[in-house]
């Protein structure tokens, strides 16, 4: 089906952050956009306000008429939806065009110059930074992001630009559908081993991804990664890191809550870059974003302005309260390396404060595979409160609970295990200097209430 033949789009799994960006793209195009999701959320309610038709019952009879016309309706589904899902079965049995989200993005990277950001972690922030730099520059861009940009209040940007910035998701090998013009790879720490099986298979998936970069384009890869890329002829290769590589930072200054550095580049150095969201880990993310934007023609002034005005991403080191007496923030970190970096950054920012984390582990398989790494990362903090595991798409695994992490926290770390339903009461009955909520599950739904409780103290 050609994209110009599509009159309606139906999403099986409408409420995911990545799916909603594509839904908004088609809504802007004036198409009929509808879908199913398991439960209502702030995001699905917002999509409904924007004109999307969403229902929350697995029932093919609720599919709108316009989405039952197989010659003009594109069906998009998320891999998290089980194969036996009634609505998905209906579309398959009736010969509809059915694509994964990544296939749709792949089509867009063939119609535009795709600037893609892949990696186990850092990809949402880096892609959102790059999109903001590009969008406010003379180049402009479209963008499909994995988080809500605080600059734009949405997870996509639509323009007439030839560029499209895309967060390249390695889950289920989805990023193999993409055909990047350029790509950043931030990290390759093993994850999704329920899908990949082994670390070697995970790394091989990234290696294959590098083969997909189009001749004339470029790979910008973190210099510390284990993987060996395999590039087509005509693809340039650059590396980056915090203090070494083709692109890196020098003269880093962290003072009074501000972060400034010099951007070192083989094209043109840029002095006194100021981070609009002053978090230490964002220096390295910013280097990668600036590198890709600069390679495509952004000027030094545009790079500086983009970085200075970057406002961050919802749930990525997202400050909710920031006073002299109390700091409260939420962070989507759910892989041990992400937890480590978040804990390290918050420790650097608040060296003399007592830091408490409430962590909801995400997935039984991830907890089983990395519980020791989670414990080590969390042990940088003073106090750790663990809730039960958020299962997402998984069934329970015998013997795999948050207790595994709890038992491996280092001596000296104050620790507690509570039920998710008891989090608000816990916050009411304890005092905090710095409190961070960590995880990719549904504990984030309680963040507004936590903020309210803390503000009332």
Predicted feature residues:
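Short internal beta-strands
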Residues: 31-38, 219-223, 356-359, 381-391
